[in-house]
A protein has these predicted regions:
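Alpha-helical scaffold segments that form or flank carboxylate-/histidine-based iron centers
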Residues: 322-328
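Bacterial N-terminal signal peptides that target proteins for export
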Residues: 2-17
Length: 587
């Protein structure tokens, strides 16, 4: 056998090697009702170990693509037994932090100076240029600018998952308009100089706390897998099979279920589209773009993989026992991959202080500086097209970014593999002030359209974020006196000077993107500081953080998992994709 099976860690096993290994390991070990038992395909059930056919059926009954060949490498974990505590996360994030901080429906953390014009709730920025005008002056991009450090599309894609796991800010109901003026003669949205046109924007939902308008986070603020499972019981129940398997529901092709019962989802029903045509995920934005939908589908498969793993190990568990254990592992995987792989790429190595355990005095809520400005860094990564590749990494035809929005039918047609292969091989754009036209100049009709850069600027004003320099002061940084201190790029200096009088006047999101990057990272000093603060609080203020919640064997099992392994055990993808998927292959 060319590859050996190891009882610890992940190994790329041929199907034959996997089956051989499943027949030679020892008998089951007894555990209590909260034990996570080594699956019986690895240890046998008493004197009656599973047959090869049993193993095949369990892991591939819903994987027709993987079933078509025995040459696909399998990425199955092996682990000693482990025991969970007798408590699982609540779906809405309640009973985690003192005062239920971080629970779905909580207000975001405002840890900066209030930037509202009246100090209470009137949007800021009234003395600055309009958001679309600034977008045209600063955020334009005339040609592709590939990232200089060889990261793959999985960096922005995984960041999208992390963002949607931690925060969802809905719009106000009834509508409270804060529309974006379109400059007269705008080359995209007003080429005939009609004038008086706007890009529609509704203010975010908010509550007044101590006389100040504060935005509401509809998701659990914890990095807890809510992007997969939801942040409310109704959504969670809708997605579960409740049939004894512990599974999440799937549709044809082992894809996510569709929103057949019309739960809150995007696009909203007022668009006149049948909600049953769109995937239903834990977060309402699961259909936002094809890359995001692809990862959401993968995480549903990952849950069902672990549910099967656990079910075989302990057949006495009921549906909820299986489901909660699988949910705990997937949530832990998301945390592990984010902090071990994703954050060091974004911020550089050793950016966060070492973890020392749960700290009840830490506020785990998402800060407005993070959600409204900082973590919108992903928008500058976006490429003009999404690559789709076949099993030999040949193009299957690119999809333009504006054609990749709310198009689940393109996944039902081809599956998730072409998009995963594309993300693995495609270098995203540089982190800078430039945004591709696909999301900055998305024209949908006279006087209507979409500009993601302008939206980000306007949303910062809606949320009462202070200026760039004020945020630097609030986070303990020295303010910048000139645009040359913000960026060494002469072109960017010129762009900023055309839009703002000084760094004191600059919108936070724009200033963050313009900065020179910190050594070893992809972002500038201000964004680095905002991210460091947020990710340390997210970790330290979570009572269920995987490094302190899981027992040692289960923790070791989770820490062995990688995004590459997750992809290869849940799809037909094999050696055509690199194992370390956050960087493109160097060959």
């Amino acid at each position: 056998m060319s590859r050996q099976f190891a009882a610890q860690g992940l190994r790329s096993l041929s199907f034959v090697a996997f089956l051989c290994a499943s027949t030679i390991l020892g008998a089951a070990q007894s555990t209590d009702s909260f034990a996570f038992v080594l699956p019986s395909y690895l240890q046998g059930i008493g004197s009656n170990p599973l047959t090869s056919d049993d193993v095949f059926d369990i892991f591939h009954s819903k994987e027709p693509m993987a079933k078509s060949t025995t040459k696909v490498p399998m990425f199955f974990p092996a682990s000693p037994p482990a025991v969970y505590p007798n408590e699982f996360r609540r779906i809405d994030g309640s009973r985690n932090a003192p005062g239920d901080l971080g629970r779905a429906g909580s207000v975001d953390l405002r840890n900066t100076t209030i930037g509202y014009a009246d100090g209470s709730g009137t949007p800021g920025g009234a003395t600055r240029k309009g958001a679309r005008e600034i977008s045209n002056l600063v955020n334009f991009q005339t040609a592709p600018i590939p990232n200089s450090v060889n990261v793959s599309g999985f960096v922005w894609n995984w960041g999208n998952i992390v963002d949607h796991d931690m925060v969802l800010t809905k719009v106000a109901q009834p509508a409270d308009h804060f529309d974006i003026p379109i400059p007269l003669g705008d080359p995209v949205f007003d080429p005939n100089s009609r004038g008086g046109l706007f890009l529609t924007l509704n203010r975010s939902s908010a509550l007044f706390v101590d006389g100040v308008r504060q935005q509401v986070n509809s998701n659990s603020a914890f990095l807890d897998g809510s992007v997969v499972y939801g942040s409310d019981k109704q959504r969670e129940k809708e997605m579960r099979t409740l049939d004894g398997t512990g599974h999440l529901k799937t549709s044809d092709g082992n894809l996510m279920m569709f929103n057949v019962n019309g739960l809150p989802n995007q696009p909203p029903p007022d668009r006149g589209l049948d909600p049953g045509l769109f995937f239903l995920g834990g977060d309402e934005r699961s259909n936002e773009n094809l890359a995001l939908s692809t990862m959401q589908n993968l995480l549903v498969r990952e849950h069902n993989f672990w549910a099967d793993f656990i079910k075989i190990g302990d057949p006495t568990l009921d549906d909820d026992g299986i489901y909660q254990r699988a949910r705990a592992i997937v949530g832990a995987e998301i945390q592990s991959i984010t902090y071990r792989d994703f954050i060091p790429i974004l911020l550089g190595p050793n950016a966060l202080t070492p973890y020392t355990g749960y700290n009840a005095s830490v506020d785990p809520r998402v800060s407005l500086a993070f959600s409204t400005a900082g973590f919108r860094v992903g928008h500058t990564f976006l490429p003009p097209v999404l690559n789709r590749l076949d099993a030999r990494n040949r193009s299957m035809g690119d999809v333009s970014l504006n054609e990749a929005l709310f198009r689940p039918q393109l996944i039902t047609k081809l599956g998730i593999e072409p998009y995963l292969r594309g993300l693995a091989r495609q270098i995203p754009q540089e982190v800078d002030v430039s945004i591709v036209d696909g999301v900055r100049n998305f024209f949908t009709g006279v006087g209507t359209g979409f500009d993601l850069a302008a939206l980000n600027i306007q949303r910062g004003r809606d949320h009462g974020l202070p200026s760039y320099n004020q945020v630097r002061i609030d986070y303990g940084l020295v303010p910048k006196a000139t645009f040359a201190e913000v960026t060494s790029n002469l072109d960017f200096q010129s762009r900023l000077a055309s839009a703002y009088s000084s760094p004191d006047d600059m919108d936070l999101w724009v200033g963050c993107l313009a900065e020179d990057h910190v050594n070893g990272g992809l972002v500038g000093e201000t964004m680095f500081t905002i991210f460091k603060d947020q990710f340390e609080r997210t970790r330290d203020g979570d009572r269920f953080w995987y490094e302190s919640y899981l027992d040692a064997p289960t923790l070791a099992l989770v820490q062995q998992q990688t995004l590459g392994a997750m992809i290869k055990r849940n799809t037909s993808i094999a050696s055509e994709m690199q194992d370390e998927v956050f960087h493109v292959p160097t060959e």
